[in-house]
Amino acid sequence: MFKRTYIAVAALGACASLSQPAAALDVKLEVVAEGLTHPLTMVSPPGDDRRFIVEQLGTIRILTADGKLLDEPFLNIREKMRPLLQDFDEEGLLGLAFHPDYKKNGKFYIAYTARIPGVATLDKHLWWAHTNTVSEFQVSKDNPNKANRLNERKITEINWPQFNHNGHWIGFGPDGYLYISSGDGGYANDWGIGHNPAIGNGQDMSDWHGKILRIDVNNGDPYAVPKDNPFVGKKDVVPEIWASGLRNPWRCSFDMGGSRELFCADVGQNSFEEVNIITKGGNYGWRVKEGTHCFDYLHPNNHLPSCNDSGMTDPIIEYNNCNVTQDCKGLSITGGYVYRGPVKDWQGKYFFGDWSRTFAKKDGRLFVATRSGSKWAMEDVKVVNIPDFDAYVLGFGQDNQGNVYVMASVTTGPVGAQDKIYKIVAP
């Protein structure tokens, strides 16, 4: 999950090579919204300057074009979710995506952890406790700032063996299909209840966990599988799979420009955090590898000298997790966005972060990665106007102008109303 050290940079499909840390990039952070509860992401509908904020506890809030945070939520689904733990929880309202034709059809999609029927309390919190659900809703015909919460159409439902490693970022690609990140099912080491004991869920192609999924929500009931998905027609393979070998893909995003690549940060076990560029049919290694290193699920801190990683793609970025070394960046990587805003020198840079260097205090980190040919170099981001930026970095957001935002919290769990969203601007 987290880390600080030198950086691994890699060509896609090749072994990563290490480089020394680059100098920090100076930025300023401007508060655009506050009084929030664990904001995880912020997205805008196509052609709309409003920004929609996902709060983990089950609400979507609107930040208007002129910067006003509306009191009344756009959507509140708390009664559909399992109750959340207040000190720390990976469940909740996790994702939001607007249909490419939102202006015409008013459709949008959310990802959340629903109650499993018959399990209404926290007494079964650790095993088969919730269903990761992606649902379609529509905006109210009478009020553009309110959703019609009564017309839920469930798209995908995946029962989850543990409370953690949910993933469930959702987003539409440039091809118009909906992509869904799915974690390995939780617990640790891709092992235990709900995991394939022989190879883990990440490498089990008959299983939905540990994958990137790709579906067509415009056809079928409740969806269709695109014919060009890489594993369509393969025996004993889930046809919705677009890519495999992921552990806990915590925040993905499509580049608004360039070649519209899909970036996913993947939280490591104990030692290494990584960022991948997701491609059709790609296998990103878990649990055969953690980052660029051969992984032993029985001895997770002792990496193997070799492994059968044929056909696997190494990350473009890797850094050390603070669980096992002080030469590290943090504990849990948080994926971000490629910058496409007004600052010319930042074009094409990937902004991301880490939740914190420690559980003991708020010590989130911000990073930026720059491509040079086939390799990427990572550097720290220095916040010059807030020298003591003490917050947990929960997520990032992006508006239709390409600006990137930071979701920052002062608590480890979804409680209170003290959290802020910052816009990253030039110093």
Feature locations, PLM:
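Bacterial N-terminal signal peptides that target proteins for export
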Residues: 1-8
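Bacterial N-terminal signal peptides
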Residues: 8-17
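Acidic, Gly/Ser/Thr-rich repeat motifs that build Ca2+-stabilized beta-propeller blades
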Residues: 23-187, 251-254, 260-271, 329-373, ...
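Blade-edge beta-strand/turn elements of extracellular beta-propeller
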Residues: 25-34, 68-87, 136-161, 191, ...
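Extended hydrophobic/aromatic segments used for targeting, binding, or gating
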Residues: 62-64, 224, 273-277, 283-301, ...
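Predominantly five- to eight-bladed beta-propeller fold
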Residues: 128-134, 192-214, 218-220, 276-298, ...
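Acidic, glycine-rich loop-and-beta core segments that form the ion-binding/anion-interacting portion
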Residues: 230, 236-280
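Extracellular protease catalytic domains of secreted zymogens
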Residues: 264-269, 277-339, 343, 347, ...
